[in-house]
Amino acid sequence: MSVPAPRHLGNGIHQIPAPLPYKAPPWVNTYVVEAGDGLILIDCGTDWEPGWQALARGFADLGLDESQVHTLIVSHLHPDHVGMSARVVRELGCHFVMHERAASLVDRYNDTPGQARRLETLADVHGMPTDVLSAGRPEERPDFMPFIEQPDHLLTDGDAIDIGEGRSLAVLHTPGHEQAHICLRDSRTGILFSGDHILPRISPVVMYNQDTADPLGEYMTSLERLIGMGIGLTYPAHGTLIDRGDERALQILLHHRRRLSDMAELVSRADTDAWSVVTRSFRPNLDPTDWRLAFLETVSHLEHLRLSGRIGQIDTGGRILYQG
């Protein structure tokens, strides 16, 4: 799939899609916002040369001066959004900004062996076969995932980022897909930069490998918040623009509620481990990476059901089973 061309979106906002070094998603939408005294870049993609060249060409094609970028705001701590942050900061001399929860998560992001150990432990207690877990996993950290630095400045929910002429970007903390995830809302137009929180065609994966007990609960609460705000035009990090962000958020919320009900029904029939729920909930021809994502998403759903009192859990000597 070819990467779309950069384009002007109006209201001093520009979109530069940058290719990614894996099958899906094939690109990330970065956004450039004119901010009176310069430019703000929202997200930057992974650290590989095609992505960097796409950004450089995008600025040139749009008639923008990349040296005017004074701030890089990253929506969340995933490599397709933050991976090139060190290079952007070094080459453009800009500030690197994220939500305050990122400060405690950067070391975890950089700790590749620790991430692998946590996933292996989780897979073991929830019944995921070791051959499925290890299939297709790189032995070393990919080059496009360099270690990242701490942000220069930390944002909190409710902050307003001044972009000139009485206009600002409101910071909305929307954890779930990732703990430090933020959306930004333009005070003048109401446009929402949604990162991965709201996507046009898929629900972002809510993985149970985060430093929080109920990532799915946090995600659903974040969706409900945006629904209540009446979000309209939405600029996501992947895919096409969304006309009604609140309606899409509701669709995603209802999808998760249905999946929760389906999984609760499966567990009610017999005590079962998470991997058995995975194999009965997803199509059988997933590739290795998608099996791992399906597993982590399923554990998030089962733990949300358990924490909300809809199912129980027993430990059978190193193997966790869920029960209705």
Name each model feature, range by range.
Residues 93-98, 193-195, 288:
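Short hydrophobic/aromatic-enriched beta-strand-loop microsegments
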Residues 4-62, 66, 183-194, 200:
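Conserved beta-strand hairpin/beta-sheet module of binuclear metal-dependent hydrolase folds
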Residues 11-18, 138-145, 165-167:
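Short Pro/Gly-enriched beta-strand edge/turn motifs at strand-loop
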Residues 75-81, 99, 175-177, 181, ...:
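Histidine-centered divalent metal-coordination motifs
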Residues 46-52, 58-162, 243:
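Active-site HxH/HxHxD metal-binding segment of metal-dependent hydrolases
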Residues 90, 174, 306:
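Short, contiguous alpha-helical
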Residues 262-324:
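C-terminal regulatory/interaction regions
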Residues 39, 46-48, 140-153, 160, ...:
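Metallo-beta-lactamase
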